[in-house]
């Protein structure tokens, strides 16, 4: 992970990073204007400097995500162009290379198409974030009004404590606080609702894209198996290529797998090390309590079953005093025996 648990704290390098340092930065990264374009940086800074103060941070996030979308559009377009170039290059090679590169171009072009579809779904996440920003912007005036009235009251109490405007302003402050409470409650509710919906859009679309990318990668590896990469000596001819039907079938299988994929078929399932809700904890505990009476002696592997000792007594009339004496002697003998042990 880029950071440990939080983006707000620097983290120490892991043992794996110390043992195998990451590769140097790509030579295609910008060295003069930073990691973002000038236009993207300008839009983000402008969003953080203008508009209602409450909505500025979220405005910066929305503008940043717009830059992400534009970057993904470029990636999707360039990937499709790269797929075409791969197919054109392979056409001038031997039959096996020509066929495999042509089919690989089909798969790589599909990667660009999937990214293009992902952009449309990703934009729904950004639009939902904008609705939170709009609510924050609408709440800001009520906050400003309440603060303004509070400042006026404090100023009058300091300058002219007997002013007749103070009671009027206090009544206005009560109304402003009531309006602010309603607006703050709406902001709290809508923020949680829209935040959950927005990132559900994003993670569902990201999950779909990742799973489909993994499918295409698997079929791409299958295509590579059709290439005979065994070395040949000078003058030796390679065996004739007969993988046309196999490569065609691989593409058909890939298309069928992508069309039939649904979110329920996702292969990667998250595993959590804690209970999701309190009800889960109580359900597990209740289940354990219900199962406990059903366990009998000998049901648990490795359990030692102790036989019940049965005391055989004969009904012989005994004198009460003699019985008490015998009972006292048996208790003393038991105590001394336990001490010896």
Curated annotation (Swiss-Prot):
It is found in: Cytoplasm, Cell cortex. The modification Phosphothreonine is found at residue 233. Keywords: Cytoplasm, Glycoprotein, Phosphoprotein. GO terms for molecular function: lipid binding. The keyword Glycoprotein applies. GO terms for cellular component: cell periphery; cytoplasm; eisosome; eisosome filament; mitochondrial outer membrane; mitochondrion; plasma membrane. Together with PIL1, main component of eisosomes, structures at the cell periphery underneath the plasma membrane that mark the site of endocytosis. Negative regulator of cell wall integrity (CWI) in unstressed cells, probably by inhibiting protein kinase PKH1/PHK2 activity and regulating their downstream CWI pathways PKC1-MAP kinase pathway and protein kinase YPK1 pathway. Activity may be regulated by the transient increase of sphingolipid long chain bases (LCBs) during heat stress. Its main location: cytoplasm. The keyword tRNA processing does not apply. Phosphorylated by PKH1 and PKH2. Phosphorylation is stimulated by sphingolipid long chain bases (LCBs). This is Sphingolipid long chain base-responsive protein LSP1. Residues 1-32, 282-341 are annotated as: Disordered. It comes from Saccharomyces cerevisiae (strain ATCC 204508 / S288c) (Baker's yeast). Present with 104485 molecules/cell in log phase SD medium. PANTHER family: SPHINGOLIPID LONG CHAIN BASE-RESPONSIVE PROTEIN LSP1, SPHINGOLIPID LONG CHAIN BASE-RESPONSIVE PROTEIN PIL1. InterPro entries: AH/BAR_dom_sf, PIL1/LSP1. Residues 1-11, 330-341 have a biased composition (Polar residues). Residues 282-294, 305-323 have a biased composition (Acidic residues). Pfam families: Pil1. GO terms for biological process: eisosome assembly; endocytosis; membrane organization; response to heat.
């Amino acid at each position: 992970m880029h950071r440990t648990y939080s983006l707000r704290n620097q983290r120490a390098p892991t043992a794996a990073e110390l043992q195998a340092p990451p590769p140097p930065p790509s030579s295609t990264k910008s060295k003069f204007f930073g990691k973002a374009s000038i236009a993207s940086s300008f839009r983000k800074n402008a969003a953080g400097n203008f508009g209602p103060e409450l909505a500025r941070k979220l405005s910066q996030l929305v503008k940043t995500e717009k830059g992400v979308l534009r970057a993904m559009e470029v990636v999707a377009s360039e990937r499709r162009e790269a797929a075409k170039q791969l197919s054109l290059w392979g056409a001038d090679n031997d039959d096996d290379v020509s066929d495999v590169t042509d089919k690989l171009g089909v798969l790589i072009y599909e990667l660009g198409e999937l990214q293009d579809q992902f952009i449309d779904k990703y934009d729904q996440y950004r639009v939902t974030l904008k609705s939170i920003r709009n609510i924050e912007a609408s709440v800001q005036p009520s906050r400003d009004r309440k603060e303004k009235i509070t400042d006026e009251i404090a100023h009058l109490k300091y300058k002219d404590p007997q002013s007749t405007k103070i009671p009027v302003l206090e009544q206005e402050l009560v109304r402003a606080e009531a309006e602010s409470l309603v607006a703050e409650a709406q902001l709290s509710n809508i923020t949680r609702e829209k935040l959950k919906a927005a990132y559900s859009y994003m993670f569902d679309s990201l999950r779909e894209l990742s799973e489909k990318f993994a499918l295409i990668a698997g079929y791409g590896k299958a295509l590579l198996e059709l290439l005979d990469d065994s070395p040949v000596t000078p003058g030796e001819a390679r065996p004739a290529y007969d993988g046309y039907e196999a490569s065609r079938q691989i593409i058909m299988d890939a298309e069928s797998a992508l069309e039939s994929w649904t979110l329920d078929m996702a292969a990667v399932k998250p595993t959590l090390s804690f209970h999701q809700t309190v009800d889960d904890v109580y359900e597990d505990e209740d289940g354990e309590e219900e199962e406990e009476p059903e366990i009998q002696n000998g049901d648990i592997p490795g359990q030692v079953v102790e036989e019940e000792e049965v005391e055989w007594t004969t009904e012989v009339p005994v004198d009460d005093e003699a019985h008490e004496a015998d009972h006292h002697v048996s208790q003393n003998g038991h105590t001394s025996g336990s001490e010896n042990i």
